[in-house]
């Protein structure tokens, strides 16, 4: 299942998230499948994990969980930002965990490309990159993020990695 929500956060929060992407601490060493030498590297910034104090990004997760029924039964174990420039197409992959939420924080023109593609059964679905769009899906759906088609633009997506809350495992209201 894939759920797409437009204009998800209020404009002030959307703008704050977008401005924040300018100061992320990027590393250039991530792959969709680290064991696959043919997969392209791209940029990653670790925004929050279960072992770090709750922060702004965790607060965003709490808003998402409250407003997106598909992920209401989940807890978040990691939040990262993915960064891609021209030439850094993602590779088809599935995610770790049970469900994933992607958020597109930056202003974006359609001609810049950067769509996310999903493969379900034998069909491909394109979800265009659009600022303040949120995409939630089950992590076993194969997908990839395409790179920008123009130079000097960083495509940023924020990925919330989720697991289904098993009885007694996590407090869903946390």
What are these regions (language model features)?
Residues 54-174:
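Catalytic core of non-heme Fe(II) oxygenases with the double-stranded beta-helix
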């Amino acid at each position: 299942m894939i759920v797409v929500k437009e204009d998800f956060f209020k404009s002030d929060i959307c703008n704050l998230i977008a401005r924040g992407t300018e100061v992320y601490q990027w590393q250039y060493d991530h792959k969709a499948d680290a064991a696959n030498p043919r997969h392209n590297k791209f940029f990653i910034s670790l925004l929050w994990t279960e072992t770090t104090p709750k922060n702004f990004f965790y607060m965003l997760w709490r808003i998402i969980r409250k407003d997106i029924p598909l992920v209401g039964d989940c807890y978040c174990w990691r939040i990262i930002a993915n960064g891609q420039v021209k030439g850094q197409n993602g590779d088809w992959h599935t995610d770790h965990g049970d469900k994933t939420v992607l958020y597109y924080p930056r202003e974006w023109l359609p001609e810049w490309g950067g769509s996310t593609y999903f493969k379900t059964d034998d069909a491909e679905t394109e979800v265009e990159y659009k600022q303040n769009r949120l995409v939630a899906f089950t992590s076993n759906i194969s997908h990839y993020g395409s790179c920008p088609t123009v130079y000097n633009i960083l495509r940023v997506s924020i990925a919330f990695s989720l697991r289904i809350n098993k009885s007694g495992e996590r407090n869903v209201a946390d």
